[in-house]
Regions:
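Single conserved hydrophobic/aromatic residue that forms the stacking wall/gate
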Residues: 1-12
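Soluble catalytic domains of enzymes that build or remodel membrane lipids, polysaccharides, and related
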Residues: 16-233
Length: 233
């Protein structure tokens, strides 16, 4: 059942910064190349049914030289804007710069070390291809106190080290361990491996990912698509 997905829904209602409800879908670690385009097709079909305002992608969208830009065609059926940050695997692919540029042809905006603002929300993207120190510096520079700040970053390593103005951080990378015994090794490296973590009004969500890497199998974990609703108090 490696490519079976579940949907997880999360509602945040405690912020006075929000002036209207916004719905996001969050996916990560699709690993096109290792996984077939048909898997992405099914993901996009499910996202369409979720009725979201934005699709956010937390890195590792593709991972091998067998990936071709036309594998992204399922994204063209989505009417919502799509925002993407790089993970570690994109940089392992030959000609990755050109392939990243081709994402724009499929309505995907690359948000590495950039911010877009809409309504009362800052959507901040942080590239994986830099040191943690640089990631912390960029995150703190892009968030603002008066806006609700959603930060997308591939690895969940810096959450406790960044500004309290980061209201919600979305990450992937860990695959929740994917299969035994890798789950033990992942827990040794990352404090926050899967799920929702809270510190006052600050939150981190670490996804189990929407695909697999290496063995096309999962034991004790599932692929997922996450729907996040942020609402005013």
């Amino acid at each position: 059942h490696a490519l079976v997905r579940r949907q997880r829904q999360m509602c945040i209602r405690d912020s006075k910064k929000i002036d209207r409800r916004l719905n996001f879908a969050f996916i990560s670690d699709v690993h096109l190349g290792s996984n077939p385009t048909s898997h992405l097709e099914k993901i996009c079909n499910e996202v369409m049914l979720l009725d979201v305002d934005y699709l956010l992608i937390g890195g590792d969208l593709f991972d091998t030289n067998s990936f071709q830009a036309h594998d992204l065609e399922p994204f063209l059926k989505l009417e919502c804007p799509i925002y993407f940050v790089t993970g570690n695997h994109e940089y392992y692919v030959d000609g990755y710069k050109e392939k990243l540029e081709q994402l724009r042809r499929y309505n995907i905006s690359i948000l590495d070390n950039e911010v877009v603002s809409f309504s009362s929300i800052n959507l901040v993207g942080v590239s994986d291809n830099q040191s943690e120190e640089k990631q912390i510096q960029i995150t703190n520079a892009l968030v603002t106190e008066e806006m609700y700040n959603v930060v997308i970053i591939h690895k969940p390593s810096i959450w406790e080290k960044v500004s309290q103005n980061v209201d919600l951080m979305l990450s992937g990378h860990t695959h929740k361990g994917q299969i035994f015994p890798f789950n033990f090794f992942v827990r040794l490296k990352f404090k926050n491996v899967y799920g929702l973590f809270e510190d006052g009004s600050n939150r981190l969500y670490v996804s189990s990912g929407s695909g697999t890497w290496g063995p096309r199998m999962r034991l004790g974990t599932q692929n997922e698509i996450v729907k996040i609703s942020i609402q005013p108090i």
